[in-house]
C-alpha cells in the first residue's frame, strides 16, 4: 500500500475511533443541565457522530476501493470544525479551553491531511495515458 494511502487509512481509523467512542458516550450521557430540546438535538447529533465513526471504520478497512467517500468524510469533519469555530466566535470558548481546542485542531487538520493524501494517491495510481505512436 502506498504511504499516502496508509496516511488516509490511519486518519480514517482515527476518525472512526473518535466517532464511535464519542458518539456512544454522548448518546448515553446526553446534554447535562439543559432543556429537553437541546438534549434531543445533542443525542441526535451523537447518532450522526456514531454513524460517521462506523462509516469511517468501513472506509479505512476498504481503503483500496475508496475515493469519493474519503473526500466526503473529510468534508463532513471540516464542516463540523467550522461549526465549532462559529460557535466559539458567537458564544465564546467553553471551559476548559484546552479540551475544546483539542477537539478543534484535529477537526480542521485531519480533513486537509486526508484530502491531500488521497489526491496524491489518486494521481499516483491513475493509469498513464497511452503513448503516442
Task: Locate each region found by the language model.
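Cytosolic juxtamembrane helix and N-cap/initiation of the first transmembrane helix
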Residues: 1-16
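Membrane-interface helix-boundary motifs at transmembrane edges
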Residues: 1-5, 61-67
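Core segments of alpha-helical transmembrane spans in multipass integral membrane proteins
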Residues: 17-25, 39-60, 75-79
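Membrane-helix exit/interface motif
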Residues: 24-32, 53-62, 83-90
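Non-cytosolic membrane-interface motifs at loop->transmembrane helix junctions
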Residues: 35-42, 94-106
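Membrane-helix boundary connector in multi-pass membrane proteins
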Residues: 60, 82-102, 119
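Hydrophobic alpha-helical membrane segments
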Residues: 71-85
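Membrane-water interface at the C-terminal end of transmembrane alpha helices
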Residues: 108-133
